[in-house]
Amino acid sequence: NYDMGMDGASPLFAGACTEPQKELLWQKLQSPEHLWCACGLSTVDQSAPYYRRDGYWNGAVWMPYQWMFFKSALDAGLVDFAYRIADTALTLWQNECAESYCCFEHFMIESRRGAGWHQFSGLSSPIVQWFSAYYRPGTLTTGFDAFVRHTDWAPDNSTLNATLDFTAAGRSTVLAVLQPGSKAVTASVPCTVTTRHDGLLELTFALDAPCTVTISIHP
């Protein structure tokens, strides 16, 4: 793959990769020598000959494409990497807003500061979605390969019943944010449940084939 930009890794969320290709691309995305940096995913592999320290595109961090790879990480069951993308972006954005009170277009990798137009609110949508995905009770978040057919939340968001259609086999993670407190989880197929913080449940399924899954989460 001679395309060392983020679009070179886009076959991951297009479903166009072989298993060896998936493994290699995920390695590159998580490697600090390639696409991962202290403030998120670089637009261009940091080892690329056309990577620029002062780049507008070829050497910066933008939020929208990171949302795409966050969703793909959920599809791949890479729950820790999905969280790393979201948490890094939220921290970066919060630090810049506290310092400048601006809503910047993109971020420079070396300085970790906002750059470009300072009132570019349209690119802030992923920030709002990441916050909701991890911290807003009443939020259910999936990757691209899961379709939420039905949800039934308790009025206080302490209970959730949901039906999801998974369109691909393999590992896949779903995030559910409920009111804090201990929860019991039942599902129509086996799943692994982790609690990153009180109220957030990360449900990871290992699916043999595309299928419909029902989930019940309650105190």
List the predicted regions and their residue ranges.
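Mobile, glycine-enriched helix-loop/loop "lid" segments at the mouths of ligand-binding/catalytic clefts
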Residues: S31-C39
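Short, well-ordered beta-strand segments enriched in hydrophobic/aromatic residues
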Residues: S158-F166
